[in-house]
Amino acid sequence: MRKVLEGIFNADEHLQVVGNAKDGREAVALAESLKPDVITMDINMPHVDGLQATAEIMTTNPRPIVIVSSESHEGAASTLRALELGAIEFVAKPSSAIDLDMQSVKEDLLRKVRMAAKVRVVRTASRLASTIQNAIGSKTPLPAPVSTRLAPTSGLDQRFPVVVLAASTGGPATVMRIAPGFTRDFPAAVILVQHMPAAFTTQYAAQLAEFTGIRVKEAEANESLQPGTLYICPGGQHLRVTSTGRIQLDGTSGRINGYLPNIDATMESVAAFAGPLSIAGVLTGMGNDGASGAKAIKTAGGLVVAQDEATSVIFGMPAEAIKAGAVDQVLGIDDIYAAIEKRVLGICRTAPAGVR
């Protein structure tokens, strides 16, 4: 694996390999001594594995880390843990033949490594690392803010707030900071659209459920949105909400404007369904997905918050939404949940009967 990766990187005129670690222990030492612009990390290594190495690097000497892992169930679980610990991106190799494998994902790998090398802000991931490690060890949700909760409503004849969280690069660690605020009786439906392959989102839902009180599930076609549930958009599919509040999944259209899933498609459908009861959180990520969708929510009378540059791993998606004039509030990572909750509870307190 190391030799294959080194060959790919050395063949690129914009990249230079400055070190090669045989295990996690050496990776930690080289990160400290060489201070590279970016690190690629395997999960399965002797002595100290990729998870331990990622946690230590992000705690003591933060560097942008790109995980290289398999698409297996075990590979997905380990990769997601590494992202929670502060790795900012990953490349999933689809088979077991390493050389052929890496050639098949070569362009994706190079694109993500080049992008990671430009990341300026990594302190957010570093700050999260110790908190998440403790939570992983205890297997209990992180404490949620105390607030007045209102009983959720149900039924297709009801209207209730719908929150869309949109994230790409750096998203899993960022969502880990926000998700503990949501509780089982949160009076809104929450949809999370994270740019992620199909093989990963089922495992992502299972792992995210460990850190929050709200019900977490991978979204299913034709199910009705319900308050008190966080729906994760399945990888490789676009998620839309119909006029009757049902989830529509589209796995045949391919990429829309370069993205699969496409965040704009989800937000635009939520704006049409929930109108002024819609809320969007545009989080860290590269590109402009979510900008036009956020504009649709704002135009419909909903609230749009964007993560600020100081706490974003990549200030791409939030910046594009701000440029589009779609954002009401630009907030740090620790203030985003409170803004969403304030809006949701305000809607529930003022909405007439049958509209909540």
Located regions from the model:
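Conserved acid/base catalytic micro-environments in cytosolic active-site loops
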Residues: 1-14, 20-26, 32-40, 44-356
